[in-house]
Amino acid sequence: MSTRSVSSSSYRRMFGGPGTASRPSSSRSYVTTSTRTYSLGSALRPSTSRSLYASSPGGVYATRSSAVRLRSSVPGVRLLQDSVDFSLADAINTEFKNTRTNEKVELQELNDRFANYIDKVRFLEQQNKILLAELEQLKGQGKSRLGDLYEEEMRELRRQVDQLTNDKARVEVERDNLAEDIMRLREKLQEEMLQREEAENTLQSFRQDVDNASLARLDLERKVESLQEEIAFLKKLHEEEIQELQAQIQEQHVQIDVDVSKPDLTAALRDVRQQYESVAAKNLQEAEEWYKSKFADLSEAANRNNDALRQAKQESTEYRRQVQSLTCEVDALKGTNESLERQMREMEENFAVEAANYQDTIGRLQDEIQDMKEEMARHLREYQDLLNVKMALDIEIATYRKLLEGEESRISLPLPNFSSLNLRETNLDSLPLVDTHSKRTLLIKTVETRDGQVINETSQHHDDLE
């Protein structure tokens, strides 16, 4: 049985996602061609020829074409040699030429697009090289500059930390000294307060003695007044007695003049008067001496008590002044202590704020370094992706070159002349059933390239029936 199939193919480019990593040394591409042929025993149905090209995972290209074959819609038709229509062959030849022309135009467009894409890739490679050079330069400069800045910042921070530590130690020593002074002053204040209480107790006892002395003096003054009144009364009584005695003496003197023989009473009265005067003078002298002695004693006791009171007042005033001065000194020391504690807290807060700022600066510098590292890694990944795309494009260009060469060689083959067909009269229904199965041919083509050059190419054919 003779069978003939007419097939045509056209290539279309279908771009997938971005190219992934491929091996820079070599890559393999597979071309699978599936051809279906049908025997003339069945209806002359359309035949489909598919060609699938798979390269690196960066892209998938598939070409499909279909050509209309001779078809018989009536199963019982008999083909006769005299009724062959050669216009159908001319139509097929015309369609075949148009298909080949369209394929050439499509291949030319694909070549132009590939050329533009290659130019773009080269431009991107140049830009990538420039960016890599700038990145290396910035990396070298930035690393040294950041390292110097980091070291300088660290030295400054260490110096400030040491200074703050020394200031803190000095302030703590001053605080301890002030605390000791305050404790000593508090002890001294307690002692002074005890002495003040003792002085007040002594002063209270002295006041009681002074009160007792005042009462005794008042009592003595009353006694002196009573004695003075008694002395005045005695003087008055004595004067009256003297007057009476003088009157009696006058009477006796008169009587003496009359009667000379009477006894002399003047001498007796004189003696009595002298006796009374001596007794009165003695009593008066004794009273005056007793009064003077008592008054001297009371005056001495009063002076002594006044001296003790004045001394107690002076001591109390001195103690009060010392207490006030110590209180002022304690208040001043408290203010100084509070000021030093406030300064210490402010220094600690400033130190904490500066330490936090320096930590933020260090963290920011580390983040910048990490960002630069990530950016450098991203540039490297982009460069690697561009290299992978370049390798994939080199593989695709080599594969298209092979396909174009094969297509040109296939196009250059002479077409069969349908006018020379000599068909016998055959009954289509009498064909065996085995011929109704379709024959499938699987072509596996392996192309290995390196740096855009094809170094190995193999093909395998597998036939199976459907």
UniProtKB/Swiss-Prot annotation:
There is a cross-link at residues 104, 120, 129, 139, 223, 262, 294, 313, 373, 439, 445 (Glycyl lysine isopeptide (Lys-Gly) (interchain with G-Cter in SUMO2)). Residues 408-466 are annotated as: Tail. Residues 246-268 are annotated as: Linker 12. Residues 1-32 are annotated as: Disordered. Residues 154-245 are annotated as: Coil 1B. GO terms for molecular function: structural constituent of cytoskeleton. Residues 132-153 are annotated as: Linker 1. PROSITE patterns: IF_ROD_1, IF_ROD_2. GO terms for biological process: cellular response to lipopolysaccharide; cellular response to muramyl dipeptide; intermediate filament organization; positive regulation of epithelial cell migration. SMART domains: Filament. Keywords: Acetylation, Cell membrane, Coiled coil, Cytoplasm, Cytoskeleton, Glycoprotein, Intermediate filament, Isopeptide bond, Membrane, Nucleus, Phosphoprotein, S-nitrosylation, Ubl conjugation. Residues 269-407 are annotated as: Coil 2. There is a cross-link at residue 445 (Glycyl lysine isopeptide (Lys-Gly) (interchain with G-Cter in SUMO1)). The modification N6-acetyllysine is found at residues 120, 129, 139, 168, 188, 223, 235, 294, 373, 445. Glycans are attached at residues 7, 33-34. The modification Phosphothreonine is found at residues 20, 426, 436, 446, 458. It is found in: Cytoplasm; Cytoplasm, Cytoskeleton; Nucleus matrix; Cell membrane. The modification Phosphotyrosine is found at residues 53, 61, 117. The record marks 351 as: Stutter. Transmembrane segments: none annotated. Gene3D superfamilies: 1.20.5.170, Single helix bin, Vasodilator-stimulated phosphoprotein. Homomer assembled from elementary dimers. Identified in complexes that contain VIM, EZR, AHNAK, BFSP1, BFSP2, ANK2, PLEC, PRX and spectrin. Interacts with BCAS3. Interacts with LGSN. Interacts with SYNM. Interacts (via rod region) with PLEC (via CH 1 domain). Interacts with STK33. Interacts with LARP6. Interacts with RAB8B. Interacts with TOR1A; the interaction associates TOR1A with the cytoskeleton. Interacts with TOR1AIP1. Interacts with TOR1AIP1. Interacts with DIAPH1. Interacts with EPPK1; interaction is dependent of higher-order structure of intermediate filament. The central alpha-helical coiled-coil IF rod domain mediates elementary homodimerization. Belongs to the intermediate filament family. This is Vimentin. It comes from Pan troglodytes (Chimpanzee). The lineage of its organism: Eukaryota, Metazoa, Chordata, Craniata, Vertebrata. The gene is VIM.
